[in-house]
Amino acid sequence: MSRFRLLLLSLIVLCGTFLFSESTFAKTIVNPNQTYSTTTLLNDIKKLEKTYPGLVKKEVIGKSEYGRNIYAVSLGKGDSTVFINGSHHAREWITTNLTMNMIDKYAAAYHSNSNLNGYNVKKLLNNTTIWFVPMVNPDGVTLQQFGLKYFPAKDHAKIIKMNAGSKNFKRWKANAKGVDLNRQYSPNWNLLGGPKNPSYKNYNGPKVASASETKAVLSFVDKIDPEMAISYHSSGQIIFWKYQQTGSRYTQDAKYAGKLSTITGYSLVKSKSFGGGFSDWFSNVEKKPAFTIEVSPAVGETHVPLKNYAKIWSQNASIGLYTAQEGFKLFDTRNTVASEKVAKQIKTYNKTAAKLKNYYSTDIKSQSNLKVTSAHKSLYDKTSKEIKKQEKIIAKLPAKYRSKPNAALKTTKSYRDNALTYMTAIQAGDALSTTNKKLMEYLTAGKLNNTTFAAYDKLVKQTTTTESKIKKMYSKNVQRLATAKYITPAKTNKKNTDYDIARYKLLLDMEEQLENEQYDKVKKNITKYKKMKSTNLHKKLESRFKTMIKAIEDELLLLEAEVPVEPEQPAPPNKEPEVPEPTPEPDPEVPEDGTAA
């Protein structure tokens, strides 16, 4: 008996645990077992966004013909995207219940890190973002659910006319302006039959994508660039998938359609599409897999009863996850191929870019080779342009797929950068040589003035800058040659110029000291000047110095001759200092009475 009780207790605990985990997982926001209105839609979207921040986000992608918001909801964090829409047709709003329930259940599974029907939801949604537009046709849905109540009175008669005079709108498929939104897309649009004027169903509009709702969907799909699309409809438990694909695309889409059929139990439609539908457009224009899934047995011209929903959910619960899984595979394959293609293109160009090395290293054998040729500059410009082009291409790749092309482009950039470093150093060196030459000309001409001093200062700065640039050059041999050609002559001339400028400034100081009659200082500076040996580099300058020093010496002699010489005073003889004789103190006064005071 005790063993039986123990076993029973274990079963109770196990069942309780199972029920708890299921209850936790099953905590829902969306109630799909109700007439799902635009108000319910918005309230649930807001709750989902608040409950799952960073995972669920809403976006208004446009307005309906009567100004209602058309909402898109993203679920996931991946770069890969897939697209699922519902309620193109007003009476098929059960597909809004379905898509909103997907968002709710998938988000809960992600949050609890739970699998759903064998799918790792967190992994899938980290790789792929599923974009839903749960209700493409909010005007039509509102009209079908509530009649004319929420539409302007001035339009009632027109809407009733589109419904063949009936005020019962349960059969309504179109938007509230009488345009069938799933007959608005471009493939074979002009071949579609049906009404020639606005109607509750099948009127394809005055032109392709004339309806606001269709424009919003087209613009949004262009923006998110999904890998795969599911368009949900409600009648027939069938899957449309053949949209004139051929070759590998046909084989690929047939595989996907087969899996969708296996998951849902729905039949694949073998007949050709009539055209004008969203999936026709996505497959034909975007050249990507698209499937129209009809979720319920045919119920006639009305909405699907809510009693059918439980089965619809059981058949479709995994569809969004399967779509996300396969969408990511397509995304990954496409971007891997694109990444490798770009990397290959860059590597091919690198054979051309490598020729830059001849200009900045290989062909530099002597100082005479230190120059920037037009061919060098042309190849550098071409390589820079190629790098910018490839950078733009790489930037379009998701971050995960940029490493290979970036690695190849790094080599291209090294050739470009080394070429630029070389050109920059040569340009700086040539400018330094020009300044050095100019300074030499001034000194040789015997010019020492503000212009000469400015050239000297410029030489000092350019020498430092050029030396820094040379140290960055690719080859040590090229650095050595550039130093010998540019830096050594500049530093030598600077050294000699330093000496000449110092002599010149000393001469100017002596002239000023003469004017101020500071003769002792002049004499000392003359001695100092004569100890400064001539470099004999600039004859005119040296001649000028000799003239100046002679003039100073002559002036000093003349001035010294005019100064009167004072006779020297003999020093006084050494003797003891005179000591003054003491002065006798007066006798104290004696009073008349003969007593001392």
Predicted regions and their residues:
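Long, low-complexity, intrinsically disordered segments
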Residues: P572-A597
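Loop/turn elements at helix/coil->beta-strand transitions in domains of secreted/extracellular proteins
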Residues: P53-K57, R68-I70, G78-T81, N126-W131, ...
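Soluble metallo-hydrolase cores and metallopeptidase-like ectodomains found primarily
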Residues: Y36-S80
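Active-site/substrate-binding loop(s) of hydrolase catalytic cores
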Residues: D79, I94, N101-I103, A107-F240, ...
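Metallocarboxypeptidase
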Residues: K167-K170, Y185-R334
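Sec-dependent N-terminal signal peptides of Gram-positive bacterial secreted proteins and lipoproteins
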Residues: M1-A26
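Extracytoplasmic/secreted proteins, especially bacterial periplasmic and envelope-associated proteins
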Residues: Y36, T40-K47, I94-K105, W131, ...
